[in-house]
């Protein structure tokens, strides 16, 4: 399941805004069909484009899910890394993690076969991706995710969170680094 403001890439506008009752009607239909849980996809890229409407939309999802007793797994997703790399299809990580770095030229493909994406993911797992202020990407991701958890954790429908769906792995040694990243994220979220 997706929303509008929680799926909007920084680099483009997609479709039209969903009807005001979209989440209420959807969760009612899901509940009446006998299903009791869904996965709701969201993108950090989308939060940076419009933080207010992003968070309002998440709140609407949680309220509708509570109303119809449907549990939600909130999925922090990425597709082709970011709209920075793939303006036509990509979304996921915000542009400030790529800007001002000649190793990550805009529009050069975010899928696993593209050299800039491979370089970025390798740097990410090495914890060397930073914003223009020098703050590392892991810390920035944790700060973003804490906002998600703060908004959703008190809802009875919140089943859990997927920290990062579909990460790219380009060498066997990156698995250990991904483990360190996941441990870092969980430890940060447990501070709430």
Segments and roles (model prediction):
Residues 1-192:
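Active-site mouth of glycoside hydrolases
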């Amino acid at each position: 399941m997706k929303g509008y403001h929680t799926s909007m890439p920084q680099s483009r506008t997609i479709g039209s805004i969903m009807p005001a009752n979209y989440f209420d009607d959807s969760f009612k239909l899901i509940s009446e069909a006998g299903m009791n849980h869904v996965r709701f996809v969201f993108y950090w890229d989308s939060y940076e484009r419009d933080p207010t409407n992003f968070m309002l939309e998440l709140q609407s999802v949680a309220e509708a899910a509570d109303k119809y007793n449907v549990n939600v797994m909130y999925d922090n997703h990425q597709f082709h890394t970011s709209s920075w790399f793939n303006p036509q299809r990509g979304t996921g990580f915000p542009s400030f993690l790529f800007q001002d770095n000649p190793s990550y030229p805009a529009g050069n493909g975010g899928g696993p076969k593209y050299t800039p994406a491979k370089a970025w993911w390798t740097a990410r797992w090495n914890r060397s991706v930073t914003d223009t202020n020098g703050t590392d990407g892991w810390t920035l991701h944790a700060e973003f995710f804490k906002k998600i958890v703060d908004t959703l954790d008190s809802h009875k429908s919140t089943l859990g969170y997927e920290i990062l769906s579909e990460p790219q792995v380009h060498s066997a040694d990156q698995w250990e680094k991904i483990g360190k990243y996941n441990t870092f994220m969980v430890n940060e979220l447990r501070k709430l």
